Amino acid sequence: MVITDEDKNELRNLLKIATSQIPRYFNVINSTNESWQITNINECVFGMVFEKYIHDSGQYLSNKVIDEGQQNTIESTMEAYDIGIEVFSENVAEIKRQIQES
């Protein structure tokens, strides 16, 4: 799978969208805190950001494969997943900072 700089920028934008939801995630957790056994709210929110980003980036990269008529193999799927994880990993410190500030 060929990933362009434009694709990486799109993945970064998807990550920004996921992190923009941090206040909403805190609201969800706080509204149900009495019935959930959450020991670390910040880690829970981090997981919610991760799940949102992985879902959206996976859809973007799957659509890219379809739009470009590329073969969809397990290798190309894993390569796409690795690229998505790479973009996320580059921003972990910033994501955690945003969570701490919320």
Name the predicted role of every residue range.
Residues I3-E6, E10, Q37-F46, T73, ...:
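Non-transmembrane, amphipathic alpha-helical segments
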Residues D5-D7, N33, D56, D67, ...:
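Acidic-enriched, low-complexity/disordered segments with a strong bias for Aspartate over Glutamate
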Residues M1-N33:
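Short terminal alpha-helical segments
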Residues S20-V65:
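Amphipathic alpha-helical interaction modules
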Residues Q70-S102:
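Amphipathic alpha-helical binding modules
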Residues L11-L15, L61, M78:
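Generic detector of leucine side chains in alpha-helical contexts
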